[in-house]
Amino acid sequence: MSVHSILFSSEHVTEGHPDKLCDQVSDAVLDACLAGDPFSKVACESCAKTGMVMVFGEITTKAVLDYQKIVRNTIKDIGFDSADKGLDYESCNVLVAIEQQSPDICQGLGNFDSEDLGAGDQGMMFGYATDETETLMPLTYELARGLAKKYSELRRSGSLEWARPDAKTQVTVEYDYDTREGKQVLTPKRVAVVLISAQHDEHVTNDKISVDLMEKVIKAVIPANMLDAETKYWLNPSGRFVRGGPHGDAGLTGRKIIVDTYGGWGAHGGGAFSGKDPSKVDRSAAYAARWIAKSIVAGGLARRCLVQLAYAIGVAEPLSMHVETYGTGKYDDAKLLEIVKQNFKLRPYDIIQELNLRRPIYYDTSRFGHFGRKDELGTGGFTWEVPKKMVE
């Protein structure tokens, strides 16, 4: 066993990516439901293509919703205000196909305000944390997200006058991977590759795009000591990217689950988040798993941590729990699992109560990731990012 170098990559997308647009529409609908009825049962999907956005799914709520207004305001907020950008919030078609939740599912879950509330579906959910950044998120992810956020910020402010809403970023980091003494310790060394594909107007030159992305985005986000003469840059490598948003590619809720989580690190159970109320453990238990993993790393109990939870539909208690610290734990993983069980209640009701999830806090999560963030909009969200002091 030794120390050797590895390369690992993570990607991110801006709010104008067609799949992300759909995530935001679904969570905007969810927030509207929860604002009017905290006990709403929501499973809202969205899809988008040229000149069209459709919301569909199952919703049971006392809230009165204006779907047309919610969808159009979301599209406007993203920045799609003309057809040549990929979508026009004023003229696009908004289609709605919403039904009530299946009575079979509803009766199987029990009272939404009961401690015995059953999980909304089966599945396994993962949470991950690492000490390589202040947010306890992977560096590859934080850098890719940082590039996407900076691009969006400059686009919105007009500092990138040619920029349009749809963009993707990707960062490859070289790590020292130390496997001595049975551990798996990762130490970031340098940024090996930076990739940005940014939608632009038809007048700007490729050279102008490259200079702006390098000077205003990359150098503003990635520390200079992480870049070197060997770092490779791919800036709009396809050449031109005028047609973007839903005009360029169809969008669908739930297709950016790695962007939503840890950039490929840890693991993923497959369930998406957006458009789902907190009785759906795809969302609430994934938030709880991150809360546990972050609490372990923040508390100095491990340098890296992966947590898995598993549930059955209609059953309140998790079927299984697993903690993996990659040999970096203060205690062995079995001991850490016992500490977790002593400090966290993980029935859906308990997760919802502890993290205060029956509130309209989800729209902000639907762009730029669900983890490693603070409450930037003042909605009281991201409670799962506040580590819990655990009794050992």
Curated annotation (Swiss-Prot):
Signal peptide positions on this chain: none
Q: Name the Pfam families for this protein.
A: S-AdoMet_synt_C, S-AdoMet_synt_M, S-AdoMet_synt_N
Q: Which cofactor does it need?
A: Mg(2+); K(+)
UniProt binding sites for ATP: H17, D166, A167, K168, S238, G239, R240, F241, D249, R255, K256, A272, K276, K280
User: So what EC number does this one have?
Assistant: 2.5.1.6
- Which positions does UniProt annotate for Mg(2+) binding? E11
- Gene Ontology MF term list: ATP binding; metal ion binding; methionine adenosyltransferase activity
- Annotated residues for binding of L-methionine: E58, Q101, D249, K280
Catalytic reaction(s) noted? L-methionine + ATP + H2O = S-adenosyl-L-methionine + phosphate + diphosphate
What broad class of enzyme is this?
A: transferase
**What's the domain of life for this entry?**
Eukaryota
In this chain, K(+) is annotated as bound at: E45
Output the InterPro entries linked to this UniProt entry: ADOMET_SYNTHASE_CS (IPR022631), S-AdoMet_synt_C (IPR022630), S-AdoMet_synt_central (IPR022629), S-AdoMet_synt_N (IPR022628), S-AdoMet_synthetase (IPR002133), S-AdoMet_synthetase_sfam (IPR022636)
Keyword field contains Metal-binding: yes
Which biological processes are named by the entry's GO terms?
Answer: one-carbon metabolic process; S-adenosylmethionine biosynthetic process
Q: In which pathway does it act?
A: Amino-acid biosynthesis; S-adenosyl-L-methionine biosynthesis; S-adenosyl-L-methionine from L-methionine: step 1/1
The answer to whether the entry has keyword Magnesium is yes
The family database entries (NCBIfam families) matched by this protein are listed as: metK
Subunit structure and binding partners: Homodimer.
Recorded hits in HAMAP family, A to Z, give: S_AdoMet_synth1 (MF_00086)
What job does this protein perform? Catalyzes the formation of S-adenosylmethionine from methionine and ATP. The reaction comprises two steps that are both catalyzed by the same enzyme: formation of S-adenosylmethionine (AdoMet) and triphosphate, and subsequent hydrolysis of the triphosphate.
Q: What is this protein called?
A: S-adenosylmethionine synthase
Q: Which organism is it from?
A: Leishmania infantum
